[in-house]
């Protein structure tokens, strides 16, 4: 259960870090946005290492579903744009896929 905490925290740090660069490069905001962006992306990487997993690739694949869901919350609450039904369908498919990766049977390796 603690993995979900790290996944969600990491997702919002990654999104915030990327959004800082988006503000600078796409919306013409100050280049100073790079500094909190770099800090946030560094924190994202550190947080993702807190996840208990035997293999990094499997942890990152499971994280992908959480990231996609967090992105829609960012869209709704930070950018104030209402997600479409197709956005939510896409999130549901991603979360189901991530759940298969996370909870699927494991052969002894």
UniProtKB/Swiss-Prot annotation:
Annotated InterPro entries: UPF0060
Database matches in Pfam families: UPF0060 (PF02694)
Record's keyword terms, sorted: Cell inner membrane, Cell membrane, Membrane, Transmembrane, Transmembrane helix
Annotated transmembrane regions: 5-25, 27-47, 59-79, 84-104
Subcellular location per the Swiss-Prot or TrEMBL entry: Cell inner membrane
Principal localisation: membrane
Entry keyword NAD: no
Xref: SUPFAM superfamilies: Multidrug resistance efflux transporter EmrE
Membrane topology of this protein: Multi-pass membrane protein
Domain of life: Bacteria
One Gene Ontology term, aspect cellular component: plasma membrane
This protein's record includes keyword Cell inner membrane: yes
PANTHER family named among the record's database cross-references: UPF0060 MEMBRANE PROTEIN YNFA
Protein family according to the UniProt entry: Belongs to the UPF0060 family.
Protein name: UPF0060 membrane protein PA3275
Species in which this protein is naturally found: Pseudomonas aeruginosa (strain ATCC 15692 / DSM 22644 / CIP 104116 / JCM 14847 / LMG 12228 / 1C / PRS 101 / PAO1)
